[in-house]
């Protein structure tokens, strides 16, 4: 084979400058022929003897074969060098293309799996027929002082424990309570429960008057709109403006029944409370519409319309009502309390944890392909409403209302005005 140095010496020995094409066509074959002859002369004598005895045609054929072998080896060497340089690039390109395709496939599969689980467990899951009532999770904002359970109290002026005064106070309260029960001919142990029909009639008149004023003056709609506008800043950014679409305050009235007076628990028979059963069969509906801004933070580019209508169709509970003094009620909130609220009497009411509220919740999601009445959404809304109710007025939580002064005052005195008809006014004699 011809080395690189020999080829270079051949090129340097050429005194005339010729083009590359002429060199390949004319000069290169003659030079290869000379090189081959030199190679044959340098071989062994036996090989040289065979070549000299061979004919000229055989020598040419042998030369062509040897030339083709040399060219083939040179081309193979060049191809191997080119392949050794281009193979890592091809492998890296294949690796990049395969990693991109692999990531695309994995991403699509993850989205499909997420959609399958979402549709199966969120949309088509049947709502549970019975849901437990949630319990309050935070510390109560106010509570009753149970001073009667302790045997001593602390005198704030002197800073000493006065046991005798505490015992005298408890004894005086017990005697006063027994005196009230005796003079009202009420026996806590044997007295039968009352129906409260008279109270239902008075309460129904009040509710009816409230409904008439609400519908004629649009007080409820105005109050709700102003409330939503004030709280709109507290809404998350992915929710659009809330619009009221339906409002129904009902047409039936609650029924109070089975009222009984009994001693309050953990009071050592020194405090009374009333237990009243409440039953309301009505349909109170609140409907609203909004949009879920999916393409956050670019608003309004992709929005999902949502329509909700929540109706309360049944409410059953046991109401506990008691009358306490301001000293027995201790506030634990950080809000400032007026001095007037620290005196007087308070009406305290709460509901037992065995209450029952039935809802009829309708939901509609989407613009064209709409999802209607998704059970999971109904469960979430029902749970949050019950949680809101439990954290405010379900035992041990309670609501307190300060009672106004009952002593007659001149500023509160009123007189009914009787309007006479035309017939009565004509019959009235004139002086």
Curated annotation (Swiss-Prot):
Domain called SMP-LTD: residue spans: 192-404
Membrane side Cytoplasmic: residue ranges: 125-431
One Pfam match: MMM1
Biological process, per Gene Ontology: aminophospholipid transport; mitochondrial genome maintenance; mitochondrial outer membrane translocase complex assembly; mitochondrion-endoplasmic reticulum membrane tethering; protein insertion into mitochondrial outer membrane
GO cellular component: endoplasmic reticulum membrane; ERMES complex
InterPro entries associated with the record: Mmm1, MMM1_dom, SMP_LBD
Transmembrane segments: 104-124
GO molecular-function term, one example from the UniProt record: lipid transfer activity
UniProt KW Membrane keyword: yes
Keyword Endoplasmic reticulum attached: yes
Residue ranges annotated as Lumenal topological domain: 1-103
Region (Disordered): 412-431
Membrane topology, as annotated: Single-pass type I membrane protein
CDD domains in UniProt: SMP_Mmm1
Location in or out of the cell: Endoplasmic reticulum membrane
Domain statement: The SMP-LTD domain is a barrel-like domain that can bind various types of glycerophospholipids in its interior and mediate their transfer between two adjacent bilayers.
Family: Belongs to the MMM1 family.
HAMAP family: Mmm1
Name of this chain's protein: Maintenance of mitochondrial morphology protein 1
Species this protein is from: Candida glabrata (strain ATCC 2001 / BCRC 20586 / JCM 3761 / NBRC 0622 / NRRL Y-65 / CBS 138) (Yeast)
């Amino acid at each position: 084979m011809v080395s690189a140095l020999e080829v270079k010496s051949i090129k340097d020995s050429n005194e005339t400058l010729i083009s590359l094409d002429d060199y390949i066509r004319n000069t290169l074959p003659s030079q290869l022929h000379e090189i081959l002859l030199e190679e044959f002369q340098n071989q062994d004598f036996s090989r040289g003897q065979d070549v000299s005895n061979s004919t000229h045609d055989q020598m040419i054929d042998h030369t062509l074969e040897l030339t083709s072998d040399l060219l083939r080896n040179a081309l193979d060497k060049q191809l191997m060098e080119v392949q050794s340089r281009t193979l890592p690039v091809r492998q890296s390109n294949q690796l990049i293309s395969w990693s991109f395709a692999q990531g695309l496939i994995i991403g699509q599969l993850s989205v499909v799996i997420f959609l399958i689980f979402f549709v199966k467990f969120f949309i088509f899951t049947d709502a549970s027929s019975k849901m437990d009532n949630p319990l309050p999770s935070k510390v109560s904002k106010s509570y009753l002082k149970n001073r009667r359970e302790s045997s001593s109290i602390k005198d704030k002026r002197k800073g000493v424990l006065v046991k005798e005064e505490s015992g005298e106070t408890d004894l005086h309260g017990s005697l006063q309570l027994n005196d009230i029960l005796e003079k009202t001919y009420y026996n806590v142990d044997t007295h039968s429960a009352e129906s409260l029909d008279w109270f239902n009639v008075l309460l129904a008149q009040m509710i009816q008057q409230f409904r008439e004023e609400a519908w004629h003056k649009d007080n409820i709609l105005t109050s709700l709109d102003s409330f939503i506008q004030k709280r709109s800043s507290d809404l998350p950014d992915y929710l659009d403006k809330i619009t009221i679409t339906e409002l129904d305050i009902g047409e039936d009235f609650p029924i109070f029944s089975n009222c009984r007076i009994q001693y309050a628990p953990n009071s050592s028979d020194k405090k009374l409370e009333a237990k009243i059963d409440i039953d309301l069969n009505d349909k109170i509906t609140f409907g609203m519409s909004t949009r879920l801004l999916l393409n956050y933070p670019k608003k309004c580019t992709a929005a999902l319309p949502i329509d909700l209508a929540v109706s309360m169709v049944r409410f059953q509970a046991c109401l506990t009502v008691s009358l306490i003094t301001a000293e027995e009620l201790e506030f634990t909130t950080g809000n400032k309390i007026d001095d007037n609220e620290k005196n007087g009497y308070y009406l305290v009411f709460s509901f037992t944890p065995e209450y029952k509220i039935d809802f009829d919740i309708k939901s509609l999601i989407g613009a064209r392909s709409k999802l209607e009445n998704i059970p999971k959404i109904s469960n979430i809304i029902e749970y949050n409403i019950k949680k809101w109710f439990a954290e405010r007025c379900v035992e041990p939580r309670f609501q307190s209302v300060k009672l106004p002064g009952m002593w007659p005052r001149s500023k509160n005195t009123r007189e009914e005005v009787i309007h006479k008809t035309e017939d009565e006014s004509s019959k009235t004699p004139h002086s």
